[in-house]
């Protein structure tokens, strides 16, 4: 009974998911929410962005420049005339109006009919306005000749592109799915491909009609001719303003002239004497600048038009219709791709500009991006996943009982040592939550691992490994600690005390000389006691680098006593012999005086050549390579083991020259003869 209830719930969930997905991929009421209001607001764009740029550059910008010139002429006087001081106000106004009308430079000694005219300065603003109107003629002709036909073509084409997707989603995909299900679970991929190919061959009458329409538009070139004629006409008409403005910029540079008042226009001799008045045109410089800007702007627009036409009819490879329609079963001819001069290419550009009118555009983009899968295959897989509602393919979490090993467990430990911690995810079912978003919400499993980690016991602090550096420095630190605590007495010869245990790793004053940190224990079990590794073997030079307490006692070296404490022996001042150079300088030391120092034999040539046994410590200042540990190394080799000298005073005596074996690390030994002077 429980199994039947669970299966019915799974079936209901599958049906609900299928309904939501059908609303997403199939046309429904959500596509027509705006209705007629959206149709009124959305109007077809009959100009491409490139066409709008050309119109702005050739029409609107020159009009703005003309407006600037007219504004300057109305804001101030277009001409300044410097009349004599005896002229009345009316005479001055008459002289200014007469000179603005004539605009002829009365050169002395030149016939009046040959006087140069400055009328181009006065005519330039009107010429710019006329050129702007002329450059708008191609756009106006395109609007009248192609707008009606282009509007009807775009309406039909955009609607059919939208319907192609709907027909494929509603008709072909369910039919393919039904045929695949009829084959049973043993169907192969080859049989599936054959079913899909056969379904593609079976086309509806609407699809056949749309393919015929595309074929007819591919053989027609009416819109292509109109589009090409529009831009070629712009190139031809722009030659007129460019030539005129270049001539004006090159010839009209004069802004001052002499106006002859009272002279007859035809230069008759019967006229009275003329009064010459100097005049100036203040807007000449501004007009020259505007003419130069207009020339550059028109040249740039012509270059842009040429590049766009070459790209459109020669080098363009992408096509909005070709990229979209072949994904929904509409066949296109390759000859349309080779021949760019046809209406289908012009319509493709305008379809891309009006793509907001295609309601299923997002779905078409999804199909186009999935280039490795056919659209029918994608829809078939979606519907097949929703149609299966058996026990193994329900939208419940069937694999929720799979055990997952805790990532915090230590992988180095053997499996038999302890039972590995296991995280068991609870079994839960996915519940559909209806929202305004048609997309299904992703199922999020609870983070069980995070809960287990939060419930773990506090992890123990890591234990630091003891390195060779700590082994060498620990005796020195222990002796220094005893010295500063007040234990400065003479320890006397005796056995070396046992080394102090290393400080606890959690003490704050512990000095760490190594960066090697033990990794944290990432398990839930108790931390095991970590065995301290043995000290690394050091070389002979490192073993003698620091003296232990037993060696200090044997050599007669003791820490300096505390203040006011009686010295056990007489303190010997620093002598001049080089034997003191071999004492270590690790801390303050005092040397005990021996009972009787033996006599030193004088140096003779016979004694220089003789090699005596090594019984006394001697270090020559001229050989800095000698160290105090060299003595012990040589004596250990001769006697077979380490031993201390019988008399401490022998350390201070100056021995006779002898042969000393020097052993530095593992290098070959060298015989050195020392000579005392």
From Swiss-Prot:
It catalyses: ATP(in) = ATP(out); chloride(in) = chloride(out); iodide(out) = iodide(in); Na(+)(in) = Na(+)(out). Residues 393-423, 454-510 are annotated as: Disordered. Disulfide bonds: none annotated. Residues 11-47, 147-226, 316-643 are cytoplasmic. GO terms for biological process: cell-cell signaling; monoatomic cation transport; monoatomic ion transmembrane transport; positive regulation of interleukin-1 production; response to ischemia. The modification Phosphoserine is found at residue 593. Keywords: Cell membrane, Endoplasmic reticulum, Glycoprotein, Golgi apparatus, Ion channel, Ion transport, Membrane, Phosphoprotein, Transmembrane, Transmembrane helix, Transport. One of its GO terms (molecular function) is wide pore channel activity. The record marks 415 as: Cleavage. GO terms for cellular component: endoplasmic reticulum membrane; Golgi membrane; plasma membrane. PANTHER family: PANNEXIN, PANNEXIN-2. Homoheptameric. Belongs to the pannexin family. Ion channel with a slight anion preference. Also able to release ATP. Plays a role in regulating neurogenesis and apoptosis in keratinocytes. This is Pannexin-2. The gene is PANX2.
């Amino acid at each position: 009974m429980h199994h039947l209830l669970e299966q019915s719930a799974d079936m209901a969930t599958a049906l609900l998911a299928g309904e939501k997905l059908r609303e997403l991929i199939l046309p429904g009421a959500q596509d027509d929410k705006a209705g007629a209001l959206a149709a009124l607001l959305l109007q077809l764009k009959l100009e491409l962005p490139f066409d709008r740029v050309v119109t702005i550059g050739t029409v609107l910008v020159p009009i703005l420049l003309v407006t600037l010139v007219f504004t300057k002429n109305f804001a101030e006087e277009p001409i300044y005339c410097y009349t004599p001081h005896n002229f009345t106000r009316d005479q001055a106004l008459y002289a200014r109006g007469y000179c603005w009308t004539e605009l002829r430079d009365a050169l002395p000694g030149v016939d009046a009919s040959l006087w140069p005219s400055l009328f181009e300065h006065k005519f330039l603003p009107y010429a710019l306005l006329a050129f702007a109107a002329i450059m708008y003629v191609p756009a106006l002709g395109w609007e009248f000749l192609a707008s009606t036909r282009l509007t009807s073509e775009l309406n039909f084409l955009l609607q059919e592109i939208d319907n192609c997707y709907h027909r494929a989603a509603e008709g072909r995909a369910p039919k393919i799915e039904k045929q695949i299900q009829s084959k049973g679970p043993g169907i192969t991929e080859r049989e599936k491909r054959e079913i899909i190919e056969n379904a593609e061959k079976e086309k509806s009458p609407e699809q056949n009609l749309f393919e015929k329409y595309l074929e007819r538009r591919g053989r027609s070139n009416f819109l292509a001719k109109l589009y090409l004629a529009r831009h070629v006409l712009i190139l031809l008409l722009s030659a007129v303003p460019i030539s005129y403005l270049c001539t004006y910029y090159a010839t009209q540079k004069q802004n001052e002239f002499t106006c002859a008042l009272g002279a007859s226009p035809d230069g008759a001799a019967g006229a009275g004497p003329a009064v010459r008045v100097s005049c100036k045109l203040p807007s000449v410089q501004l007009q020259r600048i505007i003419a130069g800007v207009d020339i550059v702007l028109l040249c740039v627009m012509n270059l842009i038009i040429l590049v766009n036409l070459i790209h459109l009819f020669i080098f363009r490879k992408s096509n909005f219709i070709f990229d979209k329609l072949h994904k929904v079963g509409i066949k296109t001819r390759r000859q349309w791709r080779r021949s760019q001069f046809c209406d289908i290419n012009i319509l493709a550009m305008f379809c891309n500009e009006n793509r907001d009118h295609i309601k299923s555009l997002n779905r078409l983009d999804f199909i186009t991006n999935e280039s490795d899968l056919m659209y029918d295959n994608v829809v078939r897989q979606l519907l097949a996943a929703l149609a299966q509602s058996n026990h193994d393919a329900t939208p419940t979490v069937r694999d929720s009982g799979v055990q997952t090993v805790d990532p915090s467990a230590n992988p180095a430990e053997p499996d038999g040592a302890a039972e590995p911690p296991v995280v068991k995810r609870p079994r839960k079912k996915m519940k559909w939550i209806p929202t305004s978003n048609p997309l299904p919400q992703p199922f999020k499993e609870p983070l069980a691992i995070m809960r287990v980690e939060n419930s773990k016991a506090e992890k123990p602090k890591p234990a630091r490994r003891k390195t060779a550096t700590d082994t060498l420095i620990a005796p020195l630190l222990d002796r220094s600690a005893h010295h500063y605590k007040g234990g400065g007495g003479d320890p006397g010869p005796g056995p070396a005390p046992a080394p102090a245990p290393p400080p606890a790793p959690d003490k704050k004053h512990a000095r760490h000389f190594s960066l090697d940190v033990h990794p944290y224990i990432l398990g839930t079990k108790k931390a095991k006691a970590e065995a301290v590794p043995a000290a690394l073997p050091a070389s002979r030079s490192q073993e003698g680098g620091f003296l232990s307490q037993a060696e200090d006692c044997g050599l007669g070296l003791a820490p300096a006593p505390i203040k006011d404490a009686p010295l056990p022996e007489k303190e010997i001042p620093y002598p001049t012999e080089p034997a003191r150079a071999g004492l270590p300088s690790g801390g303050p030391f005092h040397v005990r005086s021996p009972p009787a120092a033996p006599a030193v034999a004088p140096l003779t040539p016979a004694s220089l050549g003789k090699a005596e046994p090594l019984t006394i410590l001697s270090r020559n200042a001229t050989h800095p390579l000698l160290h105090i540990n060299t003595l012990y190394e040589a004596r250990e080799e001769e006697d077979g083991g380490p031993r201390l000298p019988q008399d401490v005073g022998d350390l201070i005596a100056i021995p006779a020259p002898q042969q000393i074996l020097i052993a530095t690390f593992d290098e070959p030994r060298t015989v050195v003869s020392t000579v005392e002077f």
